[in-house]
């Protein structure tokens, strides 16, 4: 019987692989350079994210599970930046720093939601033989319940056979999301997780379920695997093991917005489940549910234990949704006890538009949980005039509750949410527009409690007033 729980009390996971730092520069583009026929981007914001094996570790940490990350980096600023980023998510890093190579970094320049350019700073590690990395792996294995080898083809796993042997000697399951068509190099692993196209590139075209099973079992025998999980997009996933019936799970995705990083989520939850003592079937079930959540988000994302628990039990993936102040304080206390970072913002959100959506997505990325405090109808009327709000409080909150970026919604009836913020005390208070941080309601209370305050830019040209004006023009 499956343990329908997203709590992994015994799990500890070790990750080794190609670690990367993803950097994003965002800016406005209004003219062409006089020097060359290229756009000029005025950089206004930037963001850093963990990539490659580091993203796998981030996925595991999001499940409130202890995780250690091993890999190769340069002795450079980007390597330090990556370690700092991971430390914020309570990920223990033990990197081998090389003076001969830079930390793999990908810099993307974006404007108006379009990627204009990507710059790669890397020299792969294919010719690097790192005994130090093997020694770190050997000494760490005994303290963990599963090993993930994250292969992005950059060379960190060029001694993958020795790594697999070390794990087998320690009786630790080894899970690998394979790269390329040479699956022989993964001989002896516990589990591979190829997607359908990767699987068919190795075994040939499969025209039926029976052929998938037949060729999958043959591959397991050929390279001495314990199991094979083929992820099949909208067709779900299929687990194959010797002398066991095929175990198929239909997709859990309701809507698919972006499959970026879904493979990392699958192998992260699989490894966590196995490290927690779950069966292959249980771990695959949880991984399938997690994949259904993450493909409904934009960009590389992680899945929290609350989201996973909610999906298992048929609740909304937006967390606990609309709630009273008392309920909010209770769940915030629980989230803080789990070490989650709480972000809070507020507004009228009268007619939801792309500027709102973009702003809330950016706010959510700054922490683990996003609270949106919404002005009551009377509060909006006092601030905006007798003709507002256009939509009543219930309607405004119902629409906001449908956004994947929003975890918790609460109403407030005063002109500002200062009292509410002082009682909730988020880790980060966010406001959009041209405010000075010290002028934002609740900022002093948040600072006094050790939190921070941040101002985010709104998307140019997007406002409720502009929407209302356009509607009035059409009417006239």
From Swiss-Prot:
Tell me which EC number(s) this protein carries: 2.7.1.167, 2.7.7.70
Keywords from the UniProt entry = ATP-binding, Carbohydrate metabolism, Kinase, Lipopolysaccharide biosynthesis, Multifunctional enzyme, Nucleotide-binding, Nucleotidyltransferase, Transferase
Cited InterPro entries = Bifunc_HldE, Cyt_trans-like, PfkB_dom, RfaE_dom_I, RfaE_dom_II, Ribokinase-like, Rossmann-like_a/b/a_fold
Which Pfam families does the UniProt record give? CTP_transf_like (PF01467), PfkB (PF00294)
Gene Ontology BP term (one): ADP-L-glycero-beta-D-manno-heptose biosynthetic process
Q: Where is this region: Ribokinase?
A: 1-318
> Which residues bind ATP per the record?
195-198
Q: List the disulfide bonds.
A: none
Name one cellular component (GO) term: cytosol
Residue span of region Cytidylyltransferase: 344-476
Q: Which residues form the active site?
A: 264
Q: Tell me what reaction this enzyme catalyses.
A: D-glycero-beta-D-manno-heptose 7-phosphate + ATP = D-glycero-beta-D-manno-heptose 1,7-bisphosphate + ADP + H(+); D-glycero-beta-D-manno-heptose 1-phosphate + ATP + H(+) = ADP-D-glycero-beta-D-manno-heptose + diphosphate
Q: In which pathway does it act?
A: Nucleotide-sugar biosynthesis; ADP-L-glycero-beta-D-manno-heptose biosynthesis; ADP-L-glycero-beta-D-manno-heptose from D-glycero-beta-D-manno-heptose 7-phosphate: step 1/4; Nucleotide-sugar biosynthesis; ADP-L-glycero-beta-D-manno-heptose biosynthesis; ADP-L-glycero-beta-D-manno-heptose from D-glycero-beta-D-manno-heptose 7-phosphate: step 3/4; Bacterial outer membrane biogenesis; LPS core biosynthesis
* Alphabetized GO MF terms: ATP binding; heptose 7-phosphate kinase activity; heptose-1-phosphate adenylyltransferase activity; phosphotransferase activity, alcohol group as acceptor
Role, per record: Catalyzes the ADP transfer from ATP to D-glycero-beta-D-manno-heptose 1-phosphate, yielding ADP-D-glycero-beta-D-manno-heptose.
Which family does the UniProt entry place this protein in? In the N-terminal section; belongs to the carbohydrate kinase PfkB family.
Q: How does it assemble?
A: Homodimer.
Q: What is this protein called?
A: Bifunctional protein HldE
Q: Which organism is it from?
A: Pasteurella multocida (strain Pm70)
Q: Upper taxonomic classification of the species?
A: Bacteria, Pseudomonadati, Pseudomonadota, Gammaproteobacteria, Pasteurellales
């Amino acid at each position: 019987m499956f343990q329908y729980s997203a709590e992994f009390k015994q799990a500890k996971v070790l990750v080794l692989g190609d670690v990367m730092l993803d950097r994003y520069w965002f800016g406005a583009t209004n003219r062409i350079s006089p020097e060359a026929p290229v756009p000029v981007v005025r950089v206004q914001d930037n963001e850093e994210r963990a990539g490659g094996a580091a993203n796998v570790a981030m996925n595991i940490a999001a499940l409130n599970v202890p995780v250690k990350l091993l890999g190769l980096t340069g002795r450079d600023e980007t390597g330090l930046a990556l370690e700092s980023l991971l430390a914020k998510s309570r990920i223990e890093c033990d990197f081998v720093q090389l003076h001969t190579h830079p930390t793999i970094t990908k810099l993307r320049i974006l404007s108006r939601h379009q990627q204009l350019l990507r710059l790669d700073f890397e020299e792969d590690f294919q010719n690097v033989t790192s005994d130090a990395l093997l020694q770190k792996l050997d000494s760490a294995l005994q303290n963990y319940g599963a090993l993930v080898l994250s292969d992005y083809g950059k060379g960190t796993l060029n001694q993958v056979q020795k790594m697999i042997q070390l794990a087998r000697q320690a009786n630790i399951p080894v899970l690998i999301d394979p790269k390329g068509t040479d699956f022989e190099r993964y001989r002896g692993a516990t589990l591979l997780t190829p997607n359908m196209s990767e699987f068919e590139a190795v075994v040939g075209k499969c025209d039926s379920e029976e052929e998938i099973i037949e060729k999958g079992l043959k591959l397991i025998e050929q390279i001495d695997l314990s199991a094979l999980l083929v992820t099949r997009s909208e067709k779900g996933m299929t687990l194959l093991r010797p002398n066991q019936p095929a175990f198929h799970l239909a997709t859990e995705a309701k809507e698919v917005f972006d499959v970026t990083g879904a493979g990392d989520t699958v192998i992260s939850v699989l490894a966590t489940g196995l490290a927690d003592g779950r069966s292959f079937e249980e771990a695959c079930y949880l991984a399938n549910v997690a994949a259904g959540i993450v493909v409904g988000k934009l960009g590389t994302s992680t899945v929290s234990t609350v989201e996973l628990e909610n999906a298992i039990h048929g609740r909304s993936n937006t967390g606990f949704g609309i709630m009273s102040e008392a309920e909010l304080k209770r769940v915030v206390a629980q989230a803080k006890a789990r070490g989650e970072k709480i972000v809070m913002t507020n507004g009228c959100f009268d007619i939801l538009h792309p500027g709102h959506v973009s702003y809330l997505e950016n706010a959510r990325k700054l922490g683990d949980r996003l609270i949106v405090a919404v002005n009551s109808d009377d509060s909006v009327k006092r601030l905006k005039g007798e003709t507002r709000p256009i939509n009543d409080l219930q309607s405004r909150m119902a629409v906001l509750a449908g956004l994947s970026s929003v975890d918790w919604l609460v109403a407030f009836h005063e002109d500002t949410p200062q009292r509410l913020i002082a009682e909730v005390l988020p880790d980060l208070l966010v406001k959009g527009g041209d405010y000075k941080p010290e002028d934002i309601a609740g900022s002093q209370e948040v600072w006094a409690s050790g939190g921070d305050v941040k101002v985010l830019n709104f998307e140019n040209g997007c406002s409720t007033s502009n929407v209302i004006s356009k509607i009035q023009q059409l009417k006239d």
